[in-house]
């Protein structure tokens, strides 16, 4: 249970806290950077991240551009990751830095790789080679890159949901691009999900499930963007 004061509205991960305003600012800066990398409405941005504040920031940034965030199961083998990167046609991969060191040959040519520093709570939880914490030479450090971009000020466009690939147990993983909902559909869906998830202003949400799965992803995206504490 977090000991963060009840007045705090934002995301808590381990000992780190990030307010909603900070998350929104970082997401807008990521969106600006992605736009400069050529990401456009309807494109895919792949994310190879454990549960982390950066995951939600990347997801919100991608949605801001009207693009599809594609979470990749980080348990996948390099050839499975390679397949999804090729199948989506993505031009950008955002990943925890330590995961990238074994993927040099799995990342297609032309894909820009952004390395997210692996946070302390993840280092404490998982067995991670400390020699792999630095961003590899074929990737860009996301934190340094983030500081180069002003918040995105482009047009407001329909925002699609993240595209979740299947596990591929009966063949290759499969993903389906659903058209972005209309404003009316979005409003109706948000009312329904708020009721189902029990989200309301000031609520506290905890997310133990992996964000590469559809239900935790849907819940986490909404809890993180609502007036709630996300732990």
Predicted regions and their residues:
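Conserved AMP-binding/adenylation subdomain of ANL enzymes
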Residues: 183-208, 212-231
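Adenylate-forming
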Residues: 1, 23, 27, 34, ...
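Solvent-exposed alpha-helix faces
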Residues: 28-32, 89, 98, 171
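Conserved AMP-binding A3 loop
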Residues: 19-21, 161-187
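A short helix-loop-beta submotif of the ANL/AMP-binding
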Residues: 44, 50-70, 74-78, 87-92, ...
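Structural core segment of the AMP-binding/adenylate-forming
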Residues: 36-37, 64-145, 155-156
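Conserved AMP-binding/adenylate-forming core of the ANL superfamily
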Residues: 7-52, 56, 60, 77-82
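Conserved pre-ATP/AMP-binding loop-to-beta segment of ANL
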Residues: 51, 133-165, 171-172, 197-204
């Amino acid at each position: 249970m977090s000991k963060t004061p009840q007045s705090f509205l934002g995301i808590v991960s381990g000992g780190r806290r990030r307010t909603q305003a900070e998350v929104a600012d970082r997401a807008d800066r990521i969106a600006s950077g992605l736009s400069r990398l050529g990401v456009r409405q309807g494109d895919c941005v792949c994310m190879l991240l454990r549960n982390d504040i950066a995951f939600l920031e990347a997801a919100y940034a991608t949605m801001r551009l009207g693009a599809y965030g594609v979470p990749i199961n980080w348990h996948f083998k390099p050839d499975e990751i390679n397949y999804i990167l090729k199948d989506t046609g993505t031009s950008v991969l955002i990943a925890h830095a330590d995961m990238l060191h074994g993927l040099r040959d799995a990342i297609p040519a032309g894909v820009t790789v952004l390395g997210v520093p692996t946070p302390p709570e993840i280092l404490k939880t998982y067995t991670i080679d400390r020699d792999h914490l630095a961003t590899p030479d074929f990737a860009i450090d996301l934190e340094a890159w983030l500081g180069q971009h002003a918040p995105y000020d482009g047009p407001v466009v329909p925002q699609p949901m993240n595209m979740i690939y299947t596990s591929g147990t009966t063949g290759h993983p499969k993903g389906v691009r659903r058209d972005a909902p209309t404003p009316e559909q979005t409003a109706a869906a948000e009312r329904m999900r708020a009721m189902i998830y029990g989200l309301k202003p000031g609520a506290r949400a905890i997310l133990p499930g992996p964000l590469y799965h559809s239900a935790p992803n849907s819940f986490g995206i909404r809890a993180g963007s609502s007036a709630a504490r996300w732990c």
